[in-house]
Curated annotation (Swiss-Prot):
SUPFAM superfamilies: (Trans)glycosidases, Chitinase insertion domain. One of its GO terms (molecular function) is chitin binding. This is Chitinase-3-like protein 1. The gene is CHI3L1. It comes from Sus scrofa (Pig). One of its GO terms (cellular component) is extracellular space. Carbohydrate-binding lectin with a preference for chitin. Has no chitinase activity. May play a role in tissue remodeling and in the capacity of cells to respond to and cope with changes in their environment. Plays a role in T-helper cell type 2 (Th2) inflammatory response and IL-13-induced inflammation, regulating allergen sensitization, inflammatory cell apoptosis, dendritic cell accumulation and M2 macrophage differentiation. Facilitates invasion of pathogenic enteric bacteria into colonic mucosa and lymphoid organs.
Length: 383
């Protein structure tokens, strides 16, 4: 009896360790609180056991120091970090930057020794005060002149985290969000250098295609499509992962991005297949209210009465209804992506974003909260 109990305990421990071997890094966006009705998401809606890391987006920089962005950020910081009372193993990070912050503001700070130093010194006390375990740098689309400065910023930030931890506290984590487009990578990131100083890199393997193009196409294909033009041969997760690994990123520090949103188009003709001409972005979702983007829970509504298709080569679905075309991810495609990243021995998966998944479980017909993120977790936890 005692031996059987011991064996059972050992098996449970092994399963826990196999699950913990992969990171599931999940972003939460503070502006999701402003969506109407069932689209409004606050940090207390998050299952504290769903992800290994939750990243709060975004912090601001004021007078070269890290700062809050929203009027109630401090309250939301506290709500998020209270989740660790229920799951002490959960790690939380604060992401600084983002799309609206812009690359030029980062450039000005990182290119000058004094402003860079001021910013770096401001980070540890801010993170400690608000209960975060680390910082995520979301310097998106740095320019050619920024490549060296970004590397210096990462190197000096890590050195500051090491120095600060000498007081006996657990060392703060440092991660970065990195664009997955080949042109953006070549222009702005010294992958081999920054990898040395980061705990993990979140590769943004989505937004490969959008309304800025003249034709329909999936924004987050796993593999290259057989009919892809030569210009699109780089626009898939498999190429991006392989390229970043080739540039020197260790597989055990690379986290592959998986979106819980889709990109939509308004068709310009009766053609509905991939490569069909478009007149612009798709109509805004009822909750997210942004042209060309739909949350997964909005896509579940859209699928009622829509015609669905699946790219067998790219391993992702799309749907059409009237003059609307939506490329998205479903449970099957995110599972395939999770299996893929395991086969490449990557560090894990990143989800953008928890508040775009069906976080209430009200929309996608399964009475399951976070269906996409949960599907990823199931694959990562499997032996």
């Amino acid at each position: 009896m005692g031996l059987r109990v011991a064996q059972t305990g050992f098996v449970a421990l092994v399963l826990l360790q196999s699950c913990a071997a992969y990171k599931l890094v999940c972003y939460y966006t503070s502006w999701s609180q402003y969506r109407e009705g069932d689209g409004s998401c606050f940090p207390d809606a998050i299952d504290p056991f769903l992800c290994t890391h939750i990243i709060y987006s975004f912090a601001n920089i004021s007078n070269n120091e890290i700062d809050t962005w929203e009027w109630n950020d401090v309250t939301l910081y506290d709500t998020l970090n209270t989740l660790k009372n229920r799951n002490p193993n959960l790690k939380t990070l604060l992401s600084v930057g983002g799309w609206n912050f812009g690359s030029q503001r980062f450039s000005k700070i990182a290119s000058k020794t004094q402003s860079r130093r001021t910013f770096i010194k401001s980070v540890p006390p801010f993170l400690r005060t608000h209960g975060f375990d680390g910082l995520d740098l979301a310097w998106l689309y740095p320019g050619r002149r920024d490549k060296r400065h970004l590397t210096t910023l990462v190197k000096e930030m890590k050195a500051e985290f090491i120095r600060e931890a000498q007081a006996g506290t657990e060392q703060l984590l440092l991660s970065a969000a990195v664009s997955a487009g080949k042109v953006a990578i070549d222009r702005g990131y010294d992958i081999a250098q920054i990898s040395q100083h980061l705990d993990f890199i979140s590769l943004l393997t989505y937004d490969f295609h959008g309304a800025w193009r003249q034709t329909t196409g999936h924004h987050s294909p796993l593999f290259r499509g057989q009919e892809d033009a030569s210009s699109d041969r780089f626009s898939n997760a498999d190429y991006a992962v392989s390229y970043v690994l080739r540039l020197g990123a260790p597989a055990n520090k690379l986290v592959m991005g998986i979106p819980t949103f889709g990109r939509s188009f308004t068709l310009a003709s009766s053609k509905t297949d991939v490569g069909a001409p478009v007149s612009g972005p798709g109509i805004p979702g009822r909750f997210t209210k942004e042209k060309g983007i739909l949350a997964y829970y909005e896509i579940c509504d859209f699928l009622q009465g829509a015609t669905t298709h699946r790219f067998r080569d790219q391993q992702v679905p799309y749907a059409t209804k009237g003059n609307q075309w939506v490329g998205y991810d479903d449970q099957e495609s995110v599972k395939n992506k999770a299996k893929y990243l395991k086969s490449r021995q990557l560090a894990g998966a990143m989800v953008w974003a928890l508040d775009l998944d069906d976080f209430r479980g009200n929309f996608c017909g399964q009475n399951l909260r976070f269906p996409l993120t949960s599907a990823i977790k199931d694959v990562l936890a499997a032996a």
